[in-house]
Curated annotation (Swiss-Prot):
It comes from Chlamydia muridarum (strain MoPn / Nigg). One of its GO terms (cellular component) is cytosol. Its main location: cytoplasm. PROSITE patterns: DAPB. It is an enzyme of class 1 (oxidoreductase). It catalyses: (S)-2,3,4,5-tetrahydrodipicolinate + NAD(+) + H2O = (2S,4S)-4-hydroxy-2,3,4,5-tetrahydrodipicolinate + NADH + H(+); (S)-2,3,4,5-tetrahydrodipicolinate + NADP(+) + H2O = (2S,4S)-4-hydroxy-2,3,4,5-tetrahydrodipicolinate + NADPH + H(+). This is 4-hydroxy-tetrahydrodipicolinate reductase.
């Protein structure tokens, strides 16, 4: 039986891509969606769909959480810009006790591989190496530093703490740029006295983010994910283990 999927932010750039993808999806039905300009109420979208995908704005996401806490449904959240909003994060955590909640600022496979390689590199390059993260996006992107860049910094800090303990807290330089129509570039550099090691990911189109959402959507349906808080990294991990340790 096909699952009905509702898009929150369905008139945005990502919403438009996902709308087209879901219309031809073999296992999903494109249900009612929501945008700030639509006549449909957000509560109505939640009630009439089996799974929700949210690419909206922080204030919309917070309202969505309030509704889902009353009527829990699995949700995939790609909205960015609320990394410092503990209220939304607390609501995500509470909702995850009842249904699968998947949150990721960048759901592309390439972004996952970059974070994985960055964490590995952070354990190999000690405190004698400086760390820098550069991120560039289109001029209309609101949040800076990007959620993806912040997740890279978190991966570095976590990896270094696991490997070196509290004795080596990294100092990370972070820079963001908003120019042109660039979909997303993220570069992590480990710079030593005699060498520089760079891990770089560049998205050529938003299609790579849409493809990642569809991979995660398939996992929700095929693997019957239990209630819990997930990131795209967690869901991609089985693929990484299969490739690396096969």
């Amino acid at each position: 039986m096909k699952k009905s999927v509702g898009l929150i932010g369905n008139t945005g750039r990502m919403g438009g891509l996902l709308t087209e993808a879901l219309r031809s999806h073999p296992r999903c039905l494109l249900g009612k969606g929501f945008s700030r300009r639509s006549q449909t109420l957000l509560k109505e979208v939640v009630l009439e769909n089996d799974i929700l995908i949210d690419f909206s704005a922080p204030e919309v996401t917070e309202t969505l959480m309030d509704i889902l806490l009353v009527t829990p449904k699995p949700v995939i959240i790609g909205t960015t810009g609320f990394s410092d909003n503990s209220v939304i994060r607390d609501k995500l955590s509470l909702l995850s006790e009842y249904v699968p909640v998947i949150f990721s600022p960048n759901m592309s496979l390439g972004a996952y591989v970059q974070r994985r390689l960055t964490a590995c590199a952070a354990k190999l390059f000690d405190a004698s190496y400086d760390v820098r993260i550069l991120e560039t996006h289109h001029r209309t992107k609101v949040d800076a530093i990007s959620g993806t860049a912040l997740s890279l910094a978190e991966a570095i800090c976590s990896a270094k703490k696991d490997h070196f303990g509290d004795e080596q807290e990294p100092c990370i330089e972070m820079f963001g740029s908003r120019v042109g129509n660039i979909f997303g570039e993220h570069e992590v550099s480990f710079v030593g006295k005699n060498e520089r090691f760079v891990i770089r990911h560049e998205a050529f189109s938003r299609q790579t983010f849409s493809d990642g959402v569809l991979i995660i959507l398939r996992k929700i349906m095929e693997e019957r994910l239990p209630a819990g808080y997930y990131t795209s990294d967690v869901l991609y991990e089985s693929l990484f283990q299969e490739v690396v340790f096969d």
